């Protein structure tokens, strides 16, 4: 089952503030979305409505606590650490083509240890995406960037 919505980064410790801010904006638009977060994680997810609707309801320039926001294609949990690429490719099937790839992690103490893994995974994922036709050969600003976010070594957000 797909988890879609929106993810927004914030400074660790400000998750409740960002969750309230995002919830306010979706409530104004009458969307049945809800915030999901963990204290000091550095991010908040908005779930419960189509990602396009949530994204349209929340203009980045109106946010105080968000550092960045992205549409959330899927959440992949309990991944086999021997093969993280296959579930990513499966989750992206039929979801469009991307002009660039960014593999990252939230700015939290717990997630900083994932920096090396994120870089190595990006180097392995990039050719697999290109082989499937999901990523252009060269960066293309006219197409969206695919953000792959490491929450832990076996938990990714797309």
Where are these predicted regions, by residue range?
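Non-catalytic nucleic-acid substrate-recognition regions in nucleic-acid-modifying enzymes
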Residues: 3-4, 9-11, 20-144
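N-terminal basic/disordered segments at the start of proteins
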Residues: 1, 15-16
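C-terminal edge-of-domain segments
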Residues: 144-158
């Amino acid at each position: 089952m797909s988890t879609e919505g929106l993810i927004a980064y914030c400074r660790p410790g400000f998750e409740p503030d960002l969750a309230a801010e995002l919830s306010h904006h979706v409530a104004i638009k009458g969307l049945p979305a809800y915030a999901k977060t963990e204290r000091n994680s550095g991010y908040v997810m908005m779930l419960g409505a189509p990602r396009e609707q949530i994204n349209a309801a929340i203009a980045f320039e109106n946010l105080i606590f968000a550092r960045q926001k992205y549409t959330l294609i899927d959440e992949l949990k309990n991944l086999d650490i021997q093969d993280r690429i296959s579930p990513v490719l499966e989750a992206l099937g039929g979801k469009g083509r991307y002009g660039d790839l960014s593999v990252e992690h939230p700015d939290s103490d717990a997630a900083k240890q994932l920096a090396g893994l994120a870089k190595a995974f990006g180097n392995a994922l990039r050719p697999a995406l290109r082989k499937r036709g999901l990523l252009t050969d060269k960066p293309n600003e006219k197409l969206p960037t695919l953000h792959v976010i490491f929450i832990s070594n076996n938990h990714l957000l797309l």
